[in-house]
Amino acid sequence: MVAAPLLRAHQAARLQSVSTSRLGLNPHVIKSAGRLQLLRGSSFSTATSKWQAGVLDRTRNIGIIAHIDAGKTTTTERMLYYSGFTRRIGDVDEGSTVTDFLPAERARGITIQSAAITFHWPPQTAGDGNTTPQEPQTPRSASSHTVNLIDTPGHADFTFEVMRSLRILDGAVCILDGVAGVEAQTEQVWHQASTYRIPRIVYVNKLDRDGAAFGRTVREVASRLGGWPAVCQIPWFEGGNGRFTGIADAINLQGLRWEEGDGKSVKMFNLEQLASEEPQLAQELKRARVALVELLSEHDEAMVEKFFDCEEDHLAVPPNDILESLRRCLLEEQGRKIIPIFAGASFRNIGVQPLLDAVTNLLPSPPETPEPEVSIGGVKGGLRRLLSGDLLVEQGEKAASAKGKHKKKSAIQAESRNAIEKLQGCALAFKVVNDPKRGVLVYVRVYSGSLDRNSILYNTNLNVSERAPRLLKMYANDAVEVDSIPEGHIGVVAGLKHTRTGDTLVTYSGNKATPPEPLNTLQLRPITVPPPVFFASVEPHSLSEEKRLQESLAMLLREDPSLHVTVDEDSGQTLLSGMGELHLEIARDRLLNDLKAKASMGRIEIGYRECPLGASGPITKIFDKEIAGRKGKAGCTATVEPFDPEETTTEPDPSTLSIQTTDGNQIIIQAPGLEVEVNKKGIEESPLLPPGLDVHALRTALQNGCLAALARGPQFTFPMHGTRVTLTFNPAEHLFGNESTPSALSAAARLATSSALRDLPSGAGTSLMEPVMNVIISVDEASLGAVVHDISSSRGGHIISLDEETPLQTTGITSNPTDDLLPPIDPNKVYAPPDPFQSSTVGIDLPSSANRPRTITAKVPLKEMVGYLKHLRSLSAGRGTFVMSVDRFEKMSAPRQKAVLAELRGDFF
């Protein structure tokens, strides 16, 4: 059944006009963009129109995730070519790809940013404008679907880019290297996708290469990714062990053989023809179909009924019923997932069209995905609960009880309905890019309603309103202007001045500058930024270039929130921090070459931390100075002691206002004698505080002052870590009427905390801490001994385990609570076709024990991992790879601290 749309797609791709546009777009793509005008001006309604429902059902927001060099960009280029989007196949080695459009990407042959592309599969034809339902036994891939594709990086330094993209995906294609199998970075991204509950299919690539082992890779999917592999295709090797020429489809019981060329010429064989052409492959295909039906029957009751309807004949089950069963199992949220597996060789143009059919047949449309989490007025829940009004009713009841009022439920429901009617659209900004021609582009995913051109967008994170002058549909680095971005789609807003990555944008009806309460507090789940571990100094060439440099750095931070900028108080140097060496190198390229900042960057350094070795006594400081021409006076008492995040917390003191843990430090604020009351608006107040200063402002000012002091240690000037600061604010001693402004309180807290850090007892003081990394190294058996010796002796690392297959969630690099509760899958119970060349040939048993893959899990100081890749490659004959993430900061031993300090000062031994 997949064969018909596959052939139709090939024919349509040949015949379609590529119009006069330099983009080479199908004219119907442009028409579909214009068709979005129908959505303009209509206020949001929970009952989506029939036309919109049809459009949404035929929309797929998917991502491509994989280890570096697994073939993500190569596969994407083939997808664009076969969909009719491009007229030639882009090549990574030539630097002619559509998705890798940054100069740094084309120079290095790697993906750095997540490129967003929209195309149609199968390519649109004149009759594809309607949204009539499909016949029951017709697969979804028979009609054209809109595919919004995100090509993500595979390099460990760009993990934040991957997380940023995963947040807005509905489904994903995970590409595996058929030679290397499941690699460390693949596991990391796979389990990140599990936390967002993203349905995934697996595509085993590079099966044309020597040493490719499809069967072994299938078993690794079971043991390392923690799911049941559903083998939907098996590779077709000429004569059983010759050249890779095609695939055998277990769903449709047919063979597909690709001719030489661009991959558009495909010859199809039914089971009888396959049996006469390749009898061994036909027998294996039958075994694959039996295994697939058996696996689905274990997880889907409807498949069991269909199996009995077909008189218990595995081969008689209709292909579309298998597709629907696979889809149900894939979209099921509970229990162990089934992982559909497909085969191909993208560089040889084999297997990409059936993969696109699988995307439209198996991956979910926006309404079928788990609802995103939102918070509104301090109440959390799902987006659909918000749009139905239930979440607003809960929030209204909570707000009424906080004010001491008792509203009727009917009145709260009426207010909720009124608020929801005013909500026209809700979107998440997941990426900000500074385009040299178009200015700042903000990539958004619309979760409800629509974003219209010239509408007012309210940013609930920054509490600012901005107009959306232009809306675009992006085709990598090219764009088509549209009038509206509808629900479930990904688009770009040009011309926004304030929006950052992770901000929530809402549109609403009415003339007010801000949405009505509580819509102004609506936030989609934000994207958490991992801590940076490398930094480099940035210096402008002259004083006149400093302003330009600051503007460029601000733009860089809007684009990539995983970068941080700080200023060293002593030297006045600007420091740029990032996730890794390559990350900072790319940031430097963007800063100097793309943003044209006239500056120089110093060498990349490691971000160490300081920690207290003992407790200080209470230190009281009174701040008494003019701030911006206004007298400010306030006081505060601070004590400092070591803090272990893993220790059990004790009951807080009754006078405690807040306990906050940030960057490995704990701040406790106590206010004895402060009589806290909640007013009618739900705001905490105290009669002892001067007008204009509520409890929230007091708490925030003290926290900010303390954080400013902790950003700089007393001995080595590195940020503090593992520090507990107790701030005591006594209104009788530390409050001076209207002079105690938030600025004065913040300054008093900073002075008291800094003094307490300097007052640590002699002999205690502070010690240096260094980042320790969780490292997973993949090598073959022959290199294992040399690599283990290098890690444990030369680099001062600690080996955790040596395993042939280590599931990543057990190593601490990432965690997925659902996987931890399920028992591991026995690879021997998994169906996998035999690999060619398994038997001994010329006296060599492949795979031999010497090249059997092994995994080393270790904890190693980051300093020893700088530039480690070239050492690993020399130890493993170029075959070793590794991935690492920050585990924790650990206190250094005295000799190690002395050596590091000597190196930082430039001393020589």
UniProtKB/Swiss-Prot annotation:
GTP binds at residues 66-73, 151-155, 205-208. GO terms for biological process: mitochondrial genome maintenance; mitochondrial translation; regulation of mitochondrial membrane potential; ribosome disassembly. Residues 1-15 form a transit peptide. The keyword Nucleotide-binding applies. Residues 57-367 form the tr-type G domain. GO terms for cellular component: mitochondrion. The keyword Transit peptide applies. Residues 121-148 are annotated as: Disordered. This is Ribosome-releasing factor 2, mitochondrial. The gene is mef2.
